[in-house]
Swiss-Prot record:
GO MF annotation, one: manganese ion binding
Protein name: Ribonuclease HII
Cofactor remark: Manganese or magnesium. Binds 1 divalent metal ion per monomer in the absence of substrate. May bind a second metal ion after substrate binding.
Keyword Phosphoprotein: no
Protein source organism: Granulibacter bethesdensis (strain ATCC BAA-1260 / CGDNIH1)
PANTHER family (UniProt xref): RIBONUCLEASE H2 SUBUNIT A, RIBONUCLEASE HII
Family label: Belongs to the RNase HII family.
Domain of life: Bacteria
Protein localization: Cytoplasm
GO BP, sorted A to Z: DNA replication, removal of RNA primer; mismatch repair
Length: 219
């Protein structure tokens, strides 16, 4: 999305972070909907002085940014000395055992716990927060409202997309380097033709449905 177009849309700001005071982290997860791969979460801990103003123009809800813009924002966030980042994930095995909601909560908790300093407050995207070692506040649509949550959404998205691209080199028939495990026609066709990998979420209804179609075709 071009800068002028983004400028006409609502952009996230750091109002909630400034109102909270103290050390504030934004928390978000990526990967609830895919048929394969982990769910990944990030926690972005801001310096006490707040969100660095020179980065604000790069940051938006990761879903609104193209891959190149996400990569630029990702690199800038990692290079910013005042910002610290924690990454958490829940595996396909954990997703199958816990269900995707609870696995997402686990990934977010792990992300916060892996910060070098536990914040005073975590701003968590959505309407439900995991049990955390700090106070938590849910912000519905937070990745479009809060800079810290938007930053976390970018970190989680880039980390997960790159992990799926690496897996795609081992399992090239599903198009994961392009679809990141989401149920695109190419991914669904690959699953129906070639069956699942150890990275597929076989507890998901759509995966079971596609595998049943594969079995019917074989019979």
């Amino acid at each position: 999305m071009q800068g002028a177009e983004r400028g006409r849309m609502q952009m996230p700001d750091d109002r909630l972070e400034r109102e909270a005071g103290g050390l504030v982290a934004g928390v978000d997860e990526v990967g609830r909907g895919p048929l394969a791969g982990p769910v990944v979460a990030a926690a972005v801990l801001l310096p006490a002085s707040g969100f660095p103003a020179h980065l604000a123009g790069l940051i938006d809800d990761s879903k609104k940014l193209d891959a190149a813009a996400r990569d630029r924002a990702f690199a800038a966030l990692l290079a910013e000395p005042g910002i610290t980042i924690g990454i958490g994930a829940a595996s396909v095995t954990e997703i199958g055992r816990l269900n995707i909601l609870h696995a997402s909560m686990l990934a977010m908790r792990r992300a916060v716990e892996r910060l070098p300093t536990i914040p005073d407050l975590a701003l968590v995207d959505g309407n439900r927060a995991p049990a955390l070692p700090c106070a938590a506040r849910c912000v519905v649509g937070g990745d479009a409202k809060c800079l810290s949550i938007a930053a976390a959404s970018i970190i989680a998205k880039v980390v997960r997309d790159r992990a799926m691209a690496r897996l795609a080199r081992r399992y090239p028939v599903y198009g994961w380097e392009r679809n990141a495990g989401y149920p695109t026609p190419a991914h669904r066709a690959g699953l129906t033709e070639f069956g699942p990998t150890p990275h597929h979420r076989t507890a998901f209804g759509l995966v079971r449905q596609l595998l049943a179609m594969r079995m019917e075709a074989v019979v």
